Amino acid sequence: MKSGRFIGVMSGTSLDGVDVVLATIDEHRVAQLASLSWPIPVSLKQAVLDICQGQQLTLSQFGQLDTQLGRLFADAVNALLKEQNLQARDIVAIGCHGQTVWHEPTGVAPHTLQIGDNNQIVARTGITVVGDFRRRDIALGGQGAPLVPAFHHALLAHSTERRMVLNIGGIANLSLLIPGQPVGGYDTGPGNMLMDAWIWRQAGKPYDKDAEWARAGKVILPLLQNMLSDPYFSQPAPKSTGREYFNYGWLERHLRHFPGVDPRDVQATLAELTAVTISEQVLLSGGCERLMVCGGGSRNPLLMARLAALLPGTEVTTTDAVGISGDDMEALAFAWLAWRTLAGLPGNLPSVTGASQETVLGAIFPANP
């Protein structure tokens, strides 16, 4: 069974940077050693946003974007290696999620697409890469997401305490770690995505730092109710979603009914939408004693306060409180999934994704010996 140093690479739906994590992994433990966040050039970020909103690209443009993202991921890995004074031979493998540009796990031909050429990463780092984690699960009838609940269960499950882990990235997803029950998990809906999109369009800021804009506004209740009527929120699990659904176009369609509203009030309403949709799903899933939050949204004081208010009797905390950096959780999970793939172990949970069976995930891109 392969063990040693692994690197996880994650570029999520929030597009706030490439997260790279170094960890030692074996069958008994996962120990994070180092991490860094690598910036995404504005031009690349905009290209990804455009394709996620349905903008058509030529095959040449698509191929260029795939190559550019692969090179970006390789640069991020090499920066971490340099910072830690490590060589390619010191790393067993890289687990790279890739950049999701489309996720459509239902319909006539279910599919998901993550780009960022793994061949570029191997060529530029000299390290074996495990990637393309989601499509095997979809081929077996699953949603292909979320995949992180298996990792949450391995690290954070408790024998008697009802726990849930909430990742608030661009999309929010919930892992249900309930003693005596199969692990559950699904995407609750938008996390930071709509809040970030709104403040970017209105103020040119990548995100609402310390929820300053949202705190200065007031929730527009009719707008909130209008958004909550979206059928995704009442859809039963298993379910997953992404930027191809909850994007700026989705927000604009709801705002057409509310002309002339204060931008800060919209920001406050979007924060409330995220908090309400999460808390409703926690309660519908039977509630928990402890909700551990990770991802960028765990740094949003308004979101954390609203979750605590909407979930009385639940201890709302961050995964940092139990020794796991909330900023690095997903990248760490894909390092762990790479380890499982190389060990020939399944990485999905049918109770979460709806797949017909457990399966080894991903494709292996071996480095030269």
Curated annotation (Swiss-Prot):
<dbReference type="GO" id="GO:0097175">
    <property type="term" value="P:1,6-anhydro-N-acetyl-beta-muramic acid catabolic process"/>
</dbReference>
<keyword id="KW-0808">Transferase</keyword>
<comment type="pathway">
    <text>Amino-sugar metabolism; 1,6-anhydro-N-acetylmuramate degradation.</text>
</comment>
<dbReference type="Pfam" id="PF03702">
    <property type="entry name" value="AnmK"/>
</dbReference>
<dbReference type="GO" id="GO:0009254">
    <property type="term" value="P:peptidoglycan turnover"/>
</dbReference>
<dbReference type="GO" id="GO:0005524">
    <property type="term" value="F:ATP binding"/>
</dbReference>
<comment type="function">
    <text>Catalyzes the specific phosphorylation of 1,6-anhydro-N-acetylmuramic acid (anhMurNAc) with the simultaneous cleavage of the 1,6-anhydro ring, generating MurNAc-6-P. Is required for the utilization of anhMurNAc either imported from the medium or derived from its own cell wall murein, and thus plays a role in cell wall recycling.</text>
</comment>
<feature type="binding site">
    <location>
        <begin position="12"/>
        <end position="19"/>
    </location>
    <ligand>
        <name>ATP</name>
    </ligand>
</feature>
<keyword id="KW-0067">ATP-binding</keyword>
<keyword id="KW-0119">Carbohydrate metabolism</keyword>
<dbReference type="InterPro" id="IPR043129">
    <property type="entry name" value="ATPase_NBD"/>
</dbReference>
<comment type="similarity">
    <text>Belongs to the anhydro-N-acetylmuramic acid kinase family.</text>
</comment>
<dbReference type="InterPro" id="IPR005338">
    <property type="entry name" value="Anhydro_N_Ac-Mur_kinase"/>
</dbReference>
<dbReference type="GO" id="GO:0016773">
    <property type="term" value="F:phosphotransferase activity, alcohol group as acceptor"/>
</dbReference>
<keyword id="KW-0418">Kinase</keyword>
<keyword id="KW-0547">Nucleotide-binding</keyword>
<protein>
    <recommendedName>
        <fullName>Anhydro-N-acetylmuramic acid kinase</fullName>
        <ecNumber>2.7.1.170</ecNumber>
    </recommendedName>
</protein>
<dbReference type="GO" id="GO:0016301">
    <property type="term" value="F:kinase activity"/>
</dbReference>
<dbReference type="GO" id="GO:0006040">
    <property type="term" value="P:amino sugar metabolic process"/>
</dbReference>
<comment type="pathway">
    <text>Cell wall biogenesis; peptidoglycan recycling.</text>
</comment>
